[in-house]
């Protein structure tokens, strides 16, 4: 087995570095758009193993990425908890906001078992993937998932969730712990179904002050890691606290994750320091892929120059956008694999 991404997570330097993209199965691909039409709703796509397998494999067939990431959504966890969830064109995910009293009635026992179609997708993808391709599972971090549950939709600064946490600290702590426990079970099931490693997406960690970051981001993720490792002691786990800034320092040590996913705002000088303590992943601005040309080439070259001589998985600093031209994605891959540093 020669899965380069796993070698990097374990701390090895592989050059040229392995590459995959967050949201690599997505709307920038015509084949994805066709499959999405067949599915009907977005949730039907997530919960239909045959279709979810197809979209997971599409970017592997087209680009030969070094990792495939399970096609699903971070909000299937609250959906399994019994919260309503729908996706509307142009509006993203919509939920009925949860209130403090409802949180105390949430039951976590057996919730992860309701996501069996996701695990079937993992099993089927692993059967069909090339042996050298790493299969990544994932979940949303409790803070990020909670922001959607409380506001009922995405917001620019997550003010509803922040205010809720200040006003109802006991309910909010229970919500984070419940989400951590269900998410841990969810990741354990994914690993059991054949995922090689898992990533925890904390897309909204950058809106918190230092104290709240510690309580709402660090502790719940550490709880997930601890519970996963109680079942799979060697589990490889990637943490992605997007927007954490200076608080990236110490995140790996405090949470127990193996590899740090970096957003594009992290200076490469700081990224290189973080790399001294272990593997990093990132961190090209997704809009450089949209722009192409020199903007793309210079961004790729800078990352390879500063971090190519250490354990690096090349990725974007967040998900690829639907506007990204396919030829620019190929240009990025060719440049990374060309190995300039």
From Swiss-Prot:
It comes from the Bacteria. One of its GO terms (molecular function) is uroporphyrinogen decarboxylase activity. Substrate binds at residues 23-27, 42, 73, 148, 203, 318. GO terms for cellular component: cytosol. The keyword Transport does not apply. SUPFAM superfamilies: UROD/MetE-like. Keywords: Cytoplasm, Decarboxylase, Lyase, Porphyrin biosynthesis. It is found in: Cytoplasm. Pathway: Porphyrin-containing compound metabolism; protoporphyrin-IX biosynthesis; coproporphyrinogen-III from 5-aminolevulinate: step 4/4. Its main location: cytoplasm. The record marks 73 as: Transition state stabilizer. Its EC number is 4.1.1.37. NCBIfam families: hemE. This is Uroporphyrinogen decarboxylase. It comes from Brucella suis biovar 1 (strain 1330).
């Amino acid at each position: 087995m020669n899965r380069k991404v796993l070698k990097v997570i374990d701390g090895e330097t592989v050059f040229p570095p392995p590459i995959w993209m967050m949201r690599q199965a997505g709307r920038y691909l015509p084949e994805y758009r066709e499959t999405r039409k067949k599915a009907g709703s977005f949730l039907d796509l997530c919960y239909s193993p045959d279709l979810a397998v197809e979209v997971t494999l599409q970017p592997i067939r087209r680009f030969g990425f070094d990792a495939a990431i399970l096609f699903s959504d971070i909000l299937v966890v609250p959906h399994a908890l019994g919260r309503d969830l729908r996706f509307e064109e142009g509006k993203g995910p919509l939920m009925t906001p949860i209130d403090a009293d409802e949180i105390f009635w949430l039951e976590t026992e057996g919730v992860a078992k309701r996501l069996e179609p996701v695990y079937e997708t993992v099993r089927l993808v692993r059967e069909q993937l090339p042996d050298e391709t790493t299969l990544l599972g994932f979940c949303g971090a409790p803070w990020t998932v909670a922001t959607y549950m409380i506001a009922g939709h995405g917001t620019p600064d997550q003010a509803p969730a922040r205010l809720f946490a200040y006003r109802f600290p006991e309910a909010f702590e229970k919500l984070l712990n419940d989400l951590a426990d269900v998410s841990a079970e969810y990741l354990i099931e994914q690993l059991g179904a054949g995922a090689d490693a898992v990533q925890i997406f904390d897309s909204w960690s950058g809106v918190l002050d230092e104290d709240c970051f510690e309580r709402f981001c660090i502790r719940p993720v550490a709880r997930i890691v601890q519970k996963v490792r109680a079942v799979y002691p060697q589990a490889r786990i990637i943490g992605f606290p997007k927007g954490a800034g200076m608080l990236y320092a110490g995140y790996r040590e405090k949470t127990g994750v193996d590899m740090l996913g970096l957003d594009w705002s992290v200076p490469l000088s700081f990224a290189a320091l973080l790399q001294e303590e272990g593997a990093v992943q990132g961190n090209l601005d997704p809009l450089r892929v949209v722009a192409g040309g020199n903007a793309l080439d210079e961004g790729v070259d800078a990352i390879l120059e500063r971090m190519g001589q250490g354990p690096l998985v090349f990725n974007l600093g967040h998900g690829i956008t639907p506007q990204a031209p396919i030829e620019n994605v190929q240009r990025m891959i060719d440049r990374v694999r060309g190995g300039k540093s």
